[in-house]
Curated annotation (Swiss-Prot):
Residue stretches making up the Helicase C-terminal domain: 564-738
Recorded catalytic activity of this chain's protein: ATP + H2O = ADP + phosphate + H(+)
Coiled coil: none
Residue numbers binding ATP: G322, E323, T324, G325, C326, G327, K328, T329
Listed name of the protein: DExH-box ATP-dependent RNA helicase DExH3
Similarity comment text for this entry: Belongs to the DExH box helicase family.
Entry keyword set: ATP-binding, Helicase, Hydrolase, Nucleotide-binding, RNA-binding
Length: 1197
């Protein structure tokens, strides 16, 4: 007999007396022998291992107090006496965190225990055992802190779950992080995410099964393609794909052509400059021009005109701050233009003024053009996504920040541009912060370029210091006084009373359902409430009457306050002087729901007295322009807007402002790689901006619907967007601009983002194929950088073009880029849901539902019945029109990239919904979750979050079953739980072929994706087929991107095999758990289960039974244990309508094991079994699932 022997040393406290154990291993059986007790101190470490068999693999940690012996048979894990040493298996985002690099201790129960306590004797001993346990943990954590390489302690001990609160408090005092994952306790040096798939025993693994004969048919097409590949697909010359893209942007805000002959340049441009000068002077001298000049002189900016122009002439960078209404946005760019034209440099100057929003760029350009007596598109123009107006003589261009960034892709030095004005930098948008880094690097190479930064707040010093102490100038604003009414003031004067019930905002059934689902997961106070909790507790409202104080005690910080807003509006409409009302809300849901409520009001919903308008960034430009028009006499205009109305736009006739004090902004949880969309408190600067909108034309009133003490608790300024959003698109732009290392470049930002956020973004771009392992742009990445959409949506467009199913893919991408076209009126919700379900069919896809709705609208438009179609089907015609315009832009961009020639040729396979579903999967990945159908519910799990939910508006959100194993989704948002939006169900074959790279696992027939998070088990020959198809498919995409003229018909046999596989996969496989323990090895006869129990103590019976039931699609077995009079226990296990009674045993654990043993004996027919017999037992259980057999035993002994 060949033996291993080792001395084991556990975790002990100083001077503790323990027993050492000698371990003798014969093949796979383990026997333990106690040696005499030894006195061991923490400083002494046993480091000796004795191996008496050549070829044995002996591993140990020199720094930990865990010694492990691993058999040379290749077992995946090794354990000794309840201590396990293993490497953490983490998803790609969590692997980036160095905190999971090494596990110091991994304690687990050496035998299964029930979760239910029996008897009172254990409870009486809890206090003493807890103290001993905490002492042991204090030593473990001390050792963890001393060892620099070890990162965390992992325990599966039941006593540690029992004492987790105490252990967690101890860890916190020692500067460590703690979290409990189901039955596992983890203490770590690094912050811990909400979910760890490597510690999830219920993480699904997929067994893939294809219909009979499908694999052989697919293999035939594949082999035929491989045989003809060398002769059919010749080597084609490579070309730089970025060149064709760049050349296609010749008409996209290109600068003046640089003339080689300066004399010729002067001869041509001089007359044009004189012409512009003459035209400008004629306008100034005209009566209309004199009147406009007189108006402009009344603006505060005019007084600073000369000083501003002098500072710009003398400095390359100037920072200008100005209060709302001072005229900086409309006047300063004009002053520069007028100065250049007056100096006869009009034809050579080119001024670009960026705005953070489309509506701002359009409205400001129209205003400036009108002040110059011109039509838009002459000397003043604009360019935003989907539309623009500019001409040959346009010298001042207003555009969004994204437009300027896209120009930098093809014009790195901004040739011909003389001035760049970046407005609203105080908002700290991600594009604006990124643009500042790029411009800061560009200025030394362009000493003639002038940069003017404009802010609406007085934080100019921050930007001045960033640009090396650039001069900062301030324009004092002129606004009429605005009286502020905080919540306590309005309650005192109006007598309105707050109660628990009138603060429930009415979103209709849909929103109420979502809030109820979220409440199930709510375990702590919301961020809104906790942020102001201290301020409210310290507040003193003694100066107010009892009714007011009582209302304030009931005030809910989480409520937007629909009813309160309605009351304030009635107060204004009934008793206040004329003037428009601007109501600041958090987002479209709030605006739409409040608008519905107000329209149902007898006064506020009367169109003869009130004009209700909405203002949101996703609305069409024509709708947004309505807010600037003055209403008819006697009608009060009420505008419901988001925070975009703080500074970006100015509604001149606003006299009253209602401020809810909140804004819905995306924050980003880098540790869990999850965006969070929650209302948050605005900053003091934003509150002042909102208040200032009321004093434009006369003294105004501002109603802050929160107490003054809450305002005092606000942050001074808003957190930059760069620190609170995912960075994938930004990182792609950095690489496309050739700016070097992503992390190094972003470290130069005004306020650099978290390193983990950058790592997550880079890993994402690598997964979708935009970057290679060295962070270089791939051909796909170069194409993605030229498309004005998110990388995942751009990938869908490119693949749709390659595989000739572009038309529906353009519709999907356009729909995901704008607001959802499906409307959900409060009073017609059921009808709206019925209309939506009509488009969904049985495809289980929000994306294909969108395609059908759009196609129906296009058909209706051809017969001039589009409006009726939208009205009947609860669709937004404006959104559908925006989608239509965006589709045209996508087509033109792809055509310029030479990926398509005409719409007919690139949409030949648009009818193939299976192929379209595959393209959607390719774009959405790695946004994938598993779908496990249960009897009354559906369980969804993602890699970073564990269990998630679907929004009820999804076509998949209200179905009893989804007959697909996977969902790919566009977006996930954490509200209180994590919700998925815009999902499509896909099969195993679609995910394997169009998802991430697939690799072979530990044995034949085992495939892995996403670093092993997704695991698939199948026949080895089928695994080879998937690997071969995936390899050829990736090569096809690569060749097409490098050589856009490549004829895809050469790959017809390959595409036939792929289309056949994705269309005929019937999802006949199943999810299993713990499948690695059942890995296919050569069948070897074992002893019967009874003998196995004797040798191993029955430790595996409960686990084995659990695995069998899971594979057969049953729930977990239920154990009922009863204590008998003779201090023995008897247990009964129940599953699938079957009860099995075990024999009396000395402990509860052994009683449950014996009951599991009886169940396994029955399933095996009391015969000898092999590992292959597990499949037979699973099939037996599946048959029993449809029948309710007689119970094996129903009486207690």
């Amino acid at each position: 007999m060949q033996l291993y022997s080792a001395i084991f040393r556990g975790h002990i406290r100083p001077n503790a007396v323990v027993g050492a154990a000698s371990m003798f291993i014969q093949h796979n059986s383990i026997q333990l022998h106690r040696s005499p007790k030894l006195l061991l101190r923490p400083s002494s470490v046993v480091r000796s291992l004795h191996c008496r068999r050549s070829g044995g693999l002996v591993t140990h940690s020199q720094r930990s107090r865990v010694l492990c012996v691993k058999a040379a048979r290749g077992d995946a894990s090794s354990s000794t006496l309840g201590i396990e040493w293993r490497a953490a298996n983490l998803p790609y985002f969590q692997r980036q965190n160095s905190g999971y690099g090494r596990i110091a201790y991994n304690d687990y129960e050496s035998s299964d225990e029930s979760d239910r306590d029996v008897g009172s004797s254990q409870s009486q001993q809890m206090a003493g055992s807890t103290l001993d346990n905490i002492d042991q943990w204090r030593f473990k954590l001390t050792m963890l802190l001393r060892n620099k390489e070890d990162q965390e302690v992992v325990s599966r001990e039941r006593k540690d779950r029992r004492d987790f609160d105490h252990i967690s408090a101890l860890a916190t005092r020692m500067g460590l992080h703690s979290r409990q994952y189901s039955k596992i306790v983890v203490i770590s040096k690094a912050p811990l995410p909400n979910y760890r798939p490597d510690l999830d025993d219920k993480r699904p693994q997929r067994e893939v099964v294809l219909p009979f004969g499908l694999q052989s048919e697919v293999d035939a097409h594949l082999h035929s393609f491989l045989d003809q590949k060398k002769t059919l697909i010749p080597e084609m010359p490579r070309q730089n794909s970025s060149e064709s893209l760049a050349n296609g942007y010749g008409n996209y805000e290109t600068p003046e052509t640089v003339m080689q002959n300066s004399l010729a340049r002067e001869r041509i441009l001089r007359p044009r400059s004189l012409q512009l000068k003459s035209k400008q002077q004629q306008w100034v001298d005209s009566p209309e021009g004199q009147k406009m000049v007189g108006f402009r002189k009344t603006l505060p900016a005019y007084k600073e005109k000369d000083a501003l122009l002098k500072a710009i002439a003398a400095n390359q960078v100037v920072v200008v701050s100005g209060e709302t209404g001072c005229g900086k946005t409309t006047q300063l760019p004009q002053y520069i233009l007028e100065s250049e034209i007056e100096a006869a440099r009009g034809a050579t100057c080119s001024i670009i003024c960026t705005q953070p929003r489309r509506i701002s760029a359009i409205s400001v350009s129209e205003r400036v053009a009108a002040e110059r007596g011109e039509q838009i598109g002459e000397s003043v123009g604009y360019k935003v996504r989907l539309e623009g107006m500019r001409g040959r003589d346009t010298r001042l261009l207003f555009c969004t920040t994204g437009v300027l960034l896209r120009r930098l892709l093809v014009d790195r030095s901004l040739k011909g541009v003389t001035h760049v004005v970046v407005d609203e930098i105080h908002e700290r948008g991600m594009n604006e912060d990124f643009l500042l880094i790029v411009l800061k690097d560009l200025l030394p190479r362009r000493p003639d370029l002038k940069l003017i930064l404009m802010s609406a707040t007085l934080n100019a010093e921050l930007f001045s210091s960033y640009f090396g102490g650039a001069p900062a100038m301030h324009i004092p604003g002129f606004t009429y006084p605005v009286r502020a009414h905080f919540l306590e003031d309005y309650l005192e004067t109006s007598g309105y009373r707050l109660t628990t019930y009138n603060q429930i905002d009415d979103y209709g059934e849909e929103k109420t359902w979502k809030m109820q689902k979220q409440a199930q997961f709510k375990k702590r106070k919301s961020l809104i409430s906790s942020a102001v909790e201290d301020a409210l507790e310290a507040a003193d409202f003694k100066g107010y009457n009892f009714r007011t104080r009582d209302s304030l005690s009931c005030w809910s910080p989480d409520s937007i306050g629909f009813n309160l807003i309605e009351n304030v509006l009635c107060h204004i409409v009934k008793g206040e002087r004329p003037g428009a009302v601007l109501v600041f809300m958090t987002g479209w849901d709030d605006i739409n729901s409040l608008k519905n409520q107000l329209e149902a009001h007898s006064l506020l919903g009367d169109p003869n007295k009130v004009l209700l308008l909405a203002c949101h960034g996703s609305m069409a430009s024509s709708e947004q322009r309505l807010i600037f028009d003055r209403p008819p006499e006697g009608i009060r205009k009420i505008v419901l807007a988001t925070n975009m109305a703080e500074t970006s736009i100015t509604i001149n006739d606003v006299v009253y402002v209602i401020d809810c004090g909140k804004a819905k902004e995306t924050s980003y949880d880098a540790l869990n790689n999850t965006p969070c969309l929650l209302p948050s408190w605005i900053s003091k600067a934003a509150a002042r901006q909102r208040r200032g909108r009321a004093g434009r034309v006369m003294p105004g009133e501002c109603y802050h619907l929160y107490p003054r003490c809450v305002y005092e608790a606000f942050a001074d300024y808003q957190q930059p967007e760069l620190l609170r959003t995912p960075l994938q698109s930004l990182c792609l732009q950095i690489k496309s601009l050739g700016l070097g290392s992503i992390s190094e470049f972003l470290s130069r930002a005004l306020q650099p983002p978290e390193a983990l956020s950058v790592q997550n973004a880079v890993e994402y771009l690598k997964i979708i194929g935009a970057l290679d392992d060295d962070e270089n742009l791939t051909p796909l990445g170069k194409n993605l950088s030229m498309l004005p959409v998110e990388p995942k949506l751009g990938k869908m467009l490119i693949l749709g073009a390659i595989f000739n199913c572009l038309d529906p893919v353009m519709t999907v991408v356009a729909g995901l880029s704008v607001r959802d076209p499906f409307l959900m009126p409060f009073d017609k919700k059921d009808l709206a849901e019925t209309a939506r379900s009509k488009f969904s069919g049985r495809d289980y896809s929000d994306h294909l539902t969108l395609v059908r709705a759009y196609n129906g609208w296009k058909d209706a438009e051809r017969t001039h019945s589009g409006y009726d179609y939208c009205w009947k089907n609860f669709l937004s015609s404006q959104t559908l029109k925006a989608m239509d315009s965006m589709r045209k832009q996508f087509f033109n961009l792809l055509k310029e990239a030479s990926l398509i020639d005409n719409i007919e040729g690139c949409s030949k396979l648009s009818h193939d919904e299976h192929l379209v579903r595959a393209i959607i999967c390719a774009g959405m990945f790695p946004g994938v979750c598993s779908v496990v159908n249960k009897e009354k519910s559906i369980t969804l799990k993602t890699m970073e979050d564990g269990q998630v939910l679907l929004y009820s508006s999804s076509v998949n959100g209200n179905v009893p079953m989804i007959p697909f194993p996977w969902l790919v989704f566009n977006d996930k948002v954490k509200v209180n739980s994590v919700f998925l939006r815009d999902s499509t169900a896909v099969s195993d074959s679609v995910l394997l072929l169009f998802g991430d790279k697939i690799s072979s696992g530990g044995f034949d027939g085992h495939l892995k994706m996403l670093g092993g998070y997704l695991e698939f088990f199948m026949k080895p020959t089928l695994a080879y087929t998937y690997l071969s198809l995936k390899r050829e498919l990736d090569e096809l995409i690569q060749n097409k991107l490098v050589n856009p003229k490549l004829d895809i018909q050469l790959y017809d046999k390959l595409m036939t095999a792929i289309r056949l596989l994705v269309s005929e996969d019937q999802c006949e496989g199943r999810f299993v758990y713990g499948r690695k323990a059942l890995s296919p090895t050569p069948a070897k006869k074992l002893k019967d289960v009874g003998a196995q129990l004797q040798n191993s103590g029955g430790e595996n019976n409960k686990n084995q039974l659990q695995t069998l039931l899971a594979r057969a699609g049953h729930g977990s077995p239920v154990y009922k244990t009863r204590q008998l009079k003779n201090n023995q226990f008897r247990s009964m296990v129940t599953f699938n309508g079957l009860d099995f009674m075990g024999k009396p045993c000395g402990s509860k654990k052994n009683a449950e094991k014996d009951a599991a043993h009886e169940a396994l004996l029955w399933l095996q027919g009391e015969s000898k079994s092999s590992l292959n017999d597990l499949n037979h037992m699973s099939m037996l259980l599946k048959k029993n699932k449809s029948k309710n057999h007689a119970k094996a035993s129903t009486k207690w002994g």
